[in-house]
């Protein structure tokens, strides 16, 4: 039986129907008030999952504020995960690496694989999502995704926002910003479909907006992760509006995306 079956039923359905919306509070965001506000906006706007920094106190705070919203915790240190899972996290994520690139911290394929193996050894039954670093060439991203399946990953997440260099205004600029992660989602989805009898779901994240989340689903993703479009806002009503716009954009195309995957 797949470990994904251990997820809350609403989250399982969102993945299976290729309409998952994850709101990312930020791997380095340990401000409990800010994280709670983001989680509440995610829940009010119709998100399926909130991704927060790996801290048991934050998990407990979000669970209290939003009891129906599943929590994913992100870190690059596997030893941090067990306490967060014990506090109520539904799943764990190795990533999001974007926070480290400005510091010059780069994650290679071997390091990501080793982090995955260590996490799986610590938490053999917990759902594990792993981000494929966008700094790798696309063919190496594809190979790493396939290798991560063998290492115990349950979901694969793409990234790419920090490598994008949009130079246009409006919708065209939003598409340019999302191009790297969209390309990764397409390439990795195809690689997993070719290499695996039961391909893992792919989550497309980094640099997405309501304009580009439908493209992510069309590229083969089972869902999307959105961070800065929500967490950079200071007004909760504005956050809710953005999340709701993302939800509507996904729901408008999710039935078509699900049919294409059959």
Regions inferred by a protein language model and the residue ranges of each:
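Alpha/beta enzyme core
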Residues: 2-204, 209-262
């Amino acid at each position: 039986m797949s470990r994904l079956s251990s997820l809350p039923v609403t989250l399982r359905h969102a993945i299976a129907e290729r309409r998952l919306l994850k709101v990312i509070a930020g791997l380095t965001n340990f401000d409990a008030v800010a994280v709670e506000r983001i989680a509440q906006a995610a829940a009010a706007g119709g998100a399926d999952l909130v991704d927060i920094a790996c801290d048991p106190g934050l998990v407990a705070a979000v669970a209290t504020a939003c009891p129906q919203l599943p929590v994913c915790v992100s870190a690059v240190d596997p030893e941090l995960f067990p306490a967060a899972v014990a506090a109520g996290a539904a799943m764990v994520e190795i990533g999001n690496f974007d926070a480290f690139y400005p510091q010059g911290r780069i994650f290679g394929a071997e390091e990501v694989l080793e982090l995955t193996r260590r996490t799986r050894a610590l938490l053999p039954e917990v759902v594990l999502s792993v981000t494929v670093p966008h700094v790798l060439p696309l063919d190496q991203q594809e190979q790493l995704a396939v290798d991560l399946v063998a290492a115990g990953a349950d979901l694969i997440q793409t990234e790419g926002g920090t490598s994008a260099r949009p130079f246009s205004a409006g919708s065209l600029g939003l598409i340019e910003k999302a191009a790297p992660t969209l390309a990764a989602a397409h390439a990795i989805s195809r690689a997993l479909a070719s290499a695996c009898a039961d391909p893992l779901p792919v989550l497309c994240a980094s640099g997405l907006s309501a304009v580009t989340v439908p493209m992510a689903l069309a590229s083969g993703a089972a869902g999307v992760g959105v961070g800065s479009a929500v967490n950079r806002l200071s007004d909760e009503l504005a956050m809710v509006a953005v999340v709701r716009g993302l939800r509507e954009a996904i729901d408008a195309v999710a039935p078509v995306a699900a049919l294409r995957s059959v």
